[in-house]
Amino acid sequence: VTFSDKLNIDSLCKENENFIYAFWHDQLLMCPFTWKNNFDILILISKHKDGDIISKVISYMGFKTIRGSTSKPGKIKNKGGFIAAKQILSSLKNNVCVGIAPDGPRGPRHEVSDGIINIARMSNKKIVPVALGFNSKWTLNTWDKFIVPKFFSRINIAWGEPIGVDNEDNSQFQILLKNKLDLLTKNVNSFQ
């Protein structure tokens, strides 16, 4: 495992400041490998059936999860989004970091929803983008092209600069976070 730009989060940890860390949904399975800090962390996982598998794997690695996802517009069915948001805000208030895939649980792929921006604004916490690259991997035929690294694959992890969210329009922060995640993803996948 190779870490790049870890100073971005080390400085937050030294200041005892927890944060929201953001990663693309296709990298969700391996996101626990990014975590080498003193803070507790919770990772948001959907309530869909595929989320059950990912939640079990991440829990097996020693991490806790928050289960919830959004419903499609016009649907009455609640998939736990409101409860998950309350748990996330409570966790952030109690000095716990939270990991969120801003393009999950149903996409579109590599597009930032406004949920993570709203959580950052309500909690007054920074968003720290992170990306993982693998020199050998399988890419599943799913909406997000979910990545499963092959055994003995080298992992490259890069942390971006923290993003503070103010009262400006969500769209500018969505674009900023997308650009940072895309650049980090490009950089971590450029190694052999």
Could you tell me what each predicted segment is?
Residues 8-11, 72-76, 163-168:
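A short acidic, often aromatic-flanked loop/helix-cap motif at beta-alpha or helix-coil junctions
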Residues 5, 23-25, 45, 161, ...:
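Pocket-edge structural micro-motifs
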Residues 20-77, 123:
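Catalytic core of membrane glycerolipid acyltransferases/transacylases, capturing the structured
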Residues 19-20, 97:
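Short, Asp-centered acidic motifs that coordinate Mg2+ and/or phosphate
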Residues 1-2, 20, 75-80, 106:
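Short, flexible loop segments at the rims of nucleotide/cofactor-binding pockets, characterized by
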Residues 1-18, 24-30:
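A short, well-structured juxtamembrane/interface segment
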Residues 2-4, 66, 158:
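General small-molecule cofactor/ligand-binding pocket signal
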Residues 36-39, 56, 60, 64, ...:
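Non-catalytic C-terminal accessory region of glycerolipid acyltransferases
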